[in-house]
Swiss-Prot record:
The keyword rRNA-binding does not apply. The active site is at E122, E267. One of its GO terms (cellular component) is plasma membrane. Residues 1-21 form the signal peptide. Residues 360-392 form a propeptide. Glycans are attached at N54, N89. One of its GO terms (molecular function) is glucan endo-1,3-beta-D-glucosidase activity. Its EC number is 3.2.1.39. Belongs to the glycosyl hydrolase 17 family. This is Glucan endo-1,3-beta-glucosidase 14.
Length: 392
């Protein structure tokens, strides 16, 4: 009886493991881990959740030491953020970048896999000319500081931008930057090319649909079957808006002389709730958008103009953030509630432990526990099957 019970127990664990592995693959998908909330689980608990989901790429908006500490030896790749408020000082005083790296990155880099620093977020959208002028010098200061530490090959330097930098996005082959930004974007792109770092874009088809629901087919923005559109200049067919937006950015970059810079999606998502005028914000649409997007990522799909380059995406966001300012939608982009329950079904069922783990040793043990238990489950299943075969 005891043997039968254990066999059943491990079969259940094996089934759970196979189900989760089939539902979502970590490769190709990242998650934005925002923390503008007062009800989120501890970083140690989040580490267990992401491990159970097989998500191995995380983007932060800062360099929270508690998060980086909790993910020590976790095999999760981190993009850490350097906030807009640091840029002006770093642009004029490179030692500020050196100090920041020594305080925020160096204590963790030997244990936690930090692969990129995102210098500023949507700088051009601020219309703050001092801030815009500070972006490239600040990025250069950070890169120089990384070089001084011998980390320039291990950690890339980039920045995330809004699609507002484009003046034209339709058709994708005619994508172009706003004229007033070109004087800043040309040297910025030259720097990206020089250090071989990707250009990050925050792309939200939701906004296009919300603003023009009568002109933009819902199926086109939700990756559902639709007629799509054909670019008259290239004859390339687009069946979803996100890919069209990415290719429009590639076209804009090409107009400034670069075909050697990869575009990556640092944010995209769909809100599960919104204000009355935020048409399309619903759990049903959010589930369709993110669920279909995850399928495309797992298929390693490229855009029509870059078919050989699988899209690189960080989904926004891991949790609903109850303290974010702005419309209701801003607080409802999360895939999960703070208690670890899915906001809607996209085939992601993770495990968020109830206990708060605080020590590094305990956190590491918990992160490895999932792997150990699954290994035992597989081993027990094989042994059990072998016994049954011998009995026959």
């Amino acid at each position: 009886m005891a043997t039968h019970s254990l066999s059943f127990f491990f079969r259940v664990l094996l089934l759970l493991f196979l189900t989760l592995s089939e539902r979502i693959k970590g490769q190709g998908v990242g998650i934005n881990y925002g923390q503008i909330a007062n009800n989120l689980p501890s970083p140690a608990r989040v580490a267990v959740l992401l491990r159970s989901l097989n998500i191995t790429r995380v983007k932060l908006y800062d360099a929270d030491p508690n998060v980086l500490f909790s993910f020590s030896n976790s095999q999760v790749d981190f993009m850490i953020g350097l906030g807009n408020e640091y840029l002006q000082n770093m642009s004029t005083d490179p030692t500020k970048a050196q100090d920041w790296l020594q305080q925020r990155l160096e204590p963790h880099i030997s244990k936690t896999r930090i692969t990129s620093i995102v210098v500023g977020n949507e700088i051009f959208k601020t219309n703050d000319h001092v801030l815009i002028q500070s972006l490239l010098p600040a990025m250069k200061s950070v890169y120089a500081a990384l070089t001084n530490l011998g980390l320039e090959k291990q950690v890339t330097v980039t920045s995330a931008h809004s699609l507002d930098i484009l003046s034209t996005s339709y058709p994708p082959s005619s994508g172009s930057f706003k004229e007033e930004f070109i004087q800043y974007l040309q040297p910025l792109l030259d720097f990206h090319s020089q250090i071989e770092s990707p250009f990050l874009i925050n792309a939200y088809p939701f906004f296009a649909y919300k603003d023009s629901p009568k002109e933009v087919p819902l199926e086109y923005v939700l990756f559902q079957p639709n007629q799509g559109m054909v670019d008259p200049n290239t004859n390339l067919h687009y069946d979803n808006m996100l890919f069209a937006q990415v290719d429009a950015l590639y076209s804009a970059i090409k107009t400034l002389g670069h075909t050697d810079i990869e575009v990556r999606i640092s944010e995209t998502g769909w809100p599960s709730k919104g204000d009355e005028n935020e048409i399309g914000a619903s759990p049903e649409n959010a589930a369709l958008y993110n669920g279909n997007l995850l399928k495309l990522i797992q298929q390693r799909k490229g855009t029509p103009a870059k078919q050989s380059v699988p899209i690189d995406v960080y989904v926004f966001a891991l949790f609903n953030e109850n303290l974010k300012p702005g419309p209701v939608s801003e607080r409802n982009y999360g895939l999960f509630y703070p208690d670890g329950k899915p906001v809607y079904n996209v085939g992601m069922q993770g495990y968020l432990p109830d206990i708060i783990y605080t020590s590094r040793a305990t956190t590491i043990k918990i992160l490895n526990l999932w792997r150990v238990v699954m290994g035992l489950a597989v081993a027990w299943f094989i042994l059990d099957m072998g016994d049954k075969m011998r009995m026959r």
